[in-house]
A protein has these predicted regions:
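Short C-terminal domain-edge/linker segments immediately following a structured domain
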Residues: 39-42, 83-84, 96, 117-124, ...
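N-terminal signal-anchor transmembrane helix
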Residues: 1-2
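Structured beta-strand-rich core segments of catalytic domains in phosphoester-bond hydrolases
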Residues: 6-106, 220
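Second-shell loop/turn segments in exported
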Residues: 11, 126-133, 158
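A solvent-exposed, charged loop/short amphipathic helix patch at secondary-structure junctions
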Residues: 103-129
Length: 236
């Protein structure tokens, strides 16, 4: 319904079941997108995490980026748009691995901010967040290298970074790019919306020879713990 030319999806899943969407169901609904690539990412045994791209333009190639992760990953596509070839990197970076119990601890801290409860809860959460951040750092380095090495001048990087705009992850990936939301969004841009963890962790970044406008965190779809983010992109 969005009319977008390119859709980038993380944690993509289809099941041959009457209760779930099958791949045929998805292709029927997305018949306006004649080109698609679906890649399984992560090195863990029995993993089912997939990243997908549906496009109205030809996808010339897709390649999973080489960095360590049991469940997460990034995929680089070359997409032909008119006379130009665009490098597009679709990301689902390392998750923070907070359990339901951890999220309850966080909610309790907010509801009843007693000194000892906050101290012990903060210590637990900081340790877990730091562990995930340390894993994301080399992932961000790999993506930054791919951006620098791209043979094509037009570059778009998007997806779930699982980290905030002031993080090493975001700074490293975005160092030579423009942030579409910073450039043309409104408000805080909160994209993760569960358990009172209200953060902007989903992004669209573009090379500086492109211009993003009307970047929007769309709250229309409520079923996910992430809101979708979209924007228009033109040549500068």
């Amino acid at each position: 319904e969005s009319g977008a030319d390119i859709l980038c999806l993380q944690e993509y899943s289809t099941v041959q079941s009457s209760k779930h969407l099958s791949q045929k169901d998805v292709e029927r609904e997305l018949k306006a997108y004649p080109y698609h690539r679906i890649n399984t990412v992560g090195s863990g045994k029995g993993h089912t995490n997939k990243i997908a791209c549906y496009s109205k333009f030809p996808i010339l190639s897709s390649r999973i980026l080489d960095y360590p992760s049991e469940y997460n990953g990034s995929v680089l596509y070359e997409i032909k748009i008119g006379e130009d070839t665009v490098t597009l990197i679709n990301n689902h970076l390392e998750s923070n691995k907070l359990t339901k119990a951890d999220k309850v601890v966080y909610e309790d801290m907010l509801k009843s901010p007693e000194k000892e409860k906050v101290k012990s809860g903060a210590r637990l959460l900081i340790r877990k967040l730091a562990e995930a951040s340390a894993i994301r750092a080399p992932q961000a380095d790999t993506i930054a290298h791919e951006i620098t090495a791209s043979p094509h001048p037009y570059i778009i990087v998007c997806g779930d970074f699982n980290d905030t705009p002031i993080s090493y992850t975001h700074r490293t990936i975005a160092q030579d790019l423009d942030d579409a939301f910073t450039q043309s969004g409104r408000g805080l841009g909160i994209s993760y919306n569960q358990n009172r963890f209200y953060f902007r962790i989903d992004n669209i970044l573009t090379s500086k020879n492109l211009r993003a406008y009307n970047c929007t965190v769309d709250r229309y779809i409520k079923e996910s713990d992430h809101y979708q983010i979209w924007c228009y992109i033109t040549k500068s």
